[in-house]
Amino acid sequence: MIKKVPVLLFFMASISITHASQTATKSLGVSITLSKAQCKINNRAGISGSFVLPMISTSGQIISSKKFTTVPIIIDCTAGGNVNQLEITFGDNSSKKIDSTTWYTTNKDLGLRFSWTKDKTQGFNLGVAHNINKSIWLEGNKKFNASVDVSPVVIRNTVQGGQYTSALPVTVTFI
């Protein structure tokens, strides 16, 4: 039986309104709910809590010491028997997709870029199912690391200061 579990990641980004010497932070709210799943995410905690995205200036420069925020996604399928196929899909092919790694926020000049935390050489494609039932993703017996690093990115040269949000649909499929 194929089970598809839709989830939604919410991201919030802040832009520095004046100078890089002024600082402010904004939380990144993320939540996932799984029902009747044979696999559990982050030890049944799902993904919740706040994650702070790096601050960027209106000229598009990241002014934080860390250039990305890691969103942990550890999928544990040890309690559910055999898992023949395990896929995760971030986003879709909607107009919110800028390219294979970048998603728009509520400001069309500001996007969020995604990459795999575990292996940066693995291609990340929004709207494409990624088979993570492979040794490269393995953390332990039937435990897989699908964590992503999220970076704010200015699409054009400058962006107006303010707070912007984005919602990224995520689907976990297991057979």
From Swiss-Prot:
Subcellular location: Fimbrium
Primary localization class, coarse: other
GO annotation, cellular component aspect: pilus
Keyword field: Disulfide bond, Fimbrium, Plasmid, Signal
GO BP annotations, alphabetical order: cell adhesion
Superkingdom, natural source: Bacteria
Sites annotated Required for stability and transport: 174
Signal sequence region: 1-20
Disulfide bonds: 39-77
Protein name as annotated: Protein FanH
Taxonomic placement: Bacteria, Pseudomonadati, Pseudomonadota, Gammaproteobacteria, Enterobacterales
Gene coding for it: fanH
